Design a protein with these regions (language model features):
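Charged, low-complexity intrinsically disordered terminal segments
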Residues: 1-180
Length: 180
């Protein structure tokens, strides 16, 4: 947060001298924040998503309004399906960008041929950005599953390791699938 402020306006220094508040330990959820953007040296966001896909053992569900991954992520999704992981991609049937819709659909044939299930949500413009890995790890935030989010935009996401939270995300995903 402070870093983003200082990038936008280097004269803002009040955040640099303040310690963050102590984190509450209520609810029993373990969560980890990660940020990315063009000024960060490492592609941390990309690495986290790639690792999540490669670590999936049983089931992986991705929900994104904009789907335009690079070849590495496509290969990881197809490899996950090939090793028996149930991989589901939920995208909007109608997109607010025709170009993005065409681009997204260009990946579908290879993914479906490898065993990835693609569900087109028809209940409006789907804007959820999430991954649910083996019903036990959730990743959500501002990042779309596309090159703009992965390489150009400032994004923030949260990884949550909590069965209760993952169960709620699973119910939300099920509601999307019912409308697909």
């Amino acid at each position: 947060f402070a870093f983003d402020w200082s990038v936008d306006d280097p004269s803002i220094t009040s955040f640099k001298d303040r310690e963050p508040p102590a984190s509450p330990h209520e609810g029993g959820a373990l969560a980890q924040e990660f940020s990315s953007g063009p000024v960060y040296r490492d592609d941390i966001l990309y690495q986290v998503l790639l690792s999540a896909i490669m670590d999936a053992r049983e089931e992986l569900t991705i929900t994104t309004p904009y789907f335009g991954p690079d070849d590495g992520l496509i290969q990881a999704l197809m490899a996950a399906a090939a090793r028996g992981v149930r991989v589901t991609l939920i995208v909007p049937k109608l997109n607010d960008s025709t170009l993005v819709a065409w681009s997204s659909k260009s990946f579908y044939e290879d993914l479906m041929n490898s065993g990835v299930k693609i569900a087109e949500f028809h209940g409006g413009l789907l804007h959820t950005k999430s991954l649910l890995i083996d019903k036990r790890i959730a990743i959500f935030g501002s990042v779309n599953f596309d090159q703009r989010s992965l390489r150009l935009n400032f994004e923030i996401s949260l990884i949550v390791y909590n069965d209760n939270f993952c169960s709620k995300l699973e119910k939300l995903i099920e509601s999307y699938l019912e409308q697909s």
